[in-house]
Amino acid sequence: MHSQPYLLSPAPNNTPFPPAEHALREPNGLLAIGGDLTPQRLLAAYRSGIFPWFTEGQPPLWWSPDPRTVFHSDSIHLSRRFRRSLRTSTWRVRADTMFAAVIDACASTPRRGQDGTWITANMREAYLTLHQHGYAHSVEVFDGTMLVGGIYGVAIGRMFFGESMFSTHNGASKIALASLAYFLHTHSVPLIDAQVENQHLLNLGAERWPRRDFLTYVRRLITQTELPACWSVLFGEKLSRDLV
């Protein structure tokens, strides 16, 4: 167990990540500081069970907490009351049609208990690049032509690493998550990494896994066949009431 996080040099040196098991206990999961946000670095992080999380003015901070928060793609919990409300919903759901708008909304939507956003300008550009390379994806919820909710993350092999979701209308982020999960389950992607627990995620069915178990699954799933680089056609357009 290390008492200090590792220091990573920036590109082009590309210092490799240390094993995720070397992350600190306090703060839980902090593994490394520094490096960069190139696609190569980000993909190496996700493949190792590591993710970036820092705010404006900080160097890149890299995390792998224990326990890890995970969804089974076939086990998203929507309450009976919420499901009933969907029966009359006219909202529509698509994928990879407004990635930039989703990440911008995730950055700007106010969140209880948070004064700012961890989605910095550099972070935004990094994930836009990953999207252009076919690794980062979004699911979007529309009320007419208005984007009212969404979620984005990174897909590698048959593993999905969730990053953030937002909602400007009550329940829209739940619809985005449930629609994403249904799509992933249909295409043999069994897990969604949700990173760090909170009560909202636990209420939706997230589980707390020992990091060693999470890493075992990640190492296996990332080697499996990738989904298409763009999901829009494969996903199609769905009605939110189809989730009932």
UniProtKB/Swiss-Prot annotation:
Enzyme Commission identifier(s): 2.3.2.6
InterPro entries associated with the record: Acyl_CoA_acyltransferase, Leu/Phe-tRNA_Trfase, Leu/Phe-tRNA_Trfase_C, Leu/Phe-tRNA_Trfase_N
Biological process according to GO: protein catabolic process
Keyword annotations: Acyltransferase, Cytoplasm, Transferase
Enzymatic class: transferase
Lineage top rank: taxon: Bacteria
Region Disordered, annotated ranges: 1-22
Subcellular location: Cytoplasm
Reactions catalysed: N-terminal L-lysyl-[protein] + L-leucyl-tRNA(Leu) = N-terminal L-leucyl-L-lysyl-[protein] + tRNA(Leu) + H(+); N-terminal L-arginyl-[protein] + L-leucyl-tRNA(Leu) = N-terminal L-leucyl-L-arginyl-[protein] + tRNA(Leu) + H(+); L-phenylalanyl-tRNA(Phe) + an N-terminal L-alpha-aminoacyl-[protein] = an N-terminal L-phenylalanyl-L-alpha-aminoacyl-[protein] + tRNA(Phe)
GO MF terms held by the record: leucyl-tRNA--protein transferase activity
Pfam family, one: Leu_Phe_trans
A single Gene Ontology CC term: cytoplasm
Glycosyltransferase keyword on record: no
Homology family: Belongs to the L/F-transferase family.
Function: Functions in the N-end rule pathway of protein degradation where it conjugates Leu, Phe and, less efficiently, Met from aminoacyl-tRNAs to the N-termini of proteins containing an N-terminal arginine or lysine.
Entry-linked HAMAP family: Leu_Phe_trans
Protein name: Leucyl/phenylalanyl-tRNA--protein transferase
Organism in which the protein naturally occurs: Xylella fastidiosa (strain M12)
Taxonomic lineage: Bacteria, Pseudomonadati, Pseudomonadota, Gammaproteobacteria, Lysobacterales
Gene that specifies this protein: aat
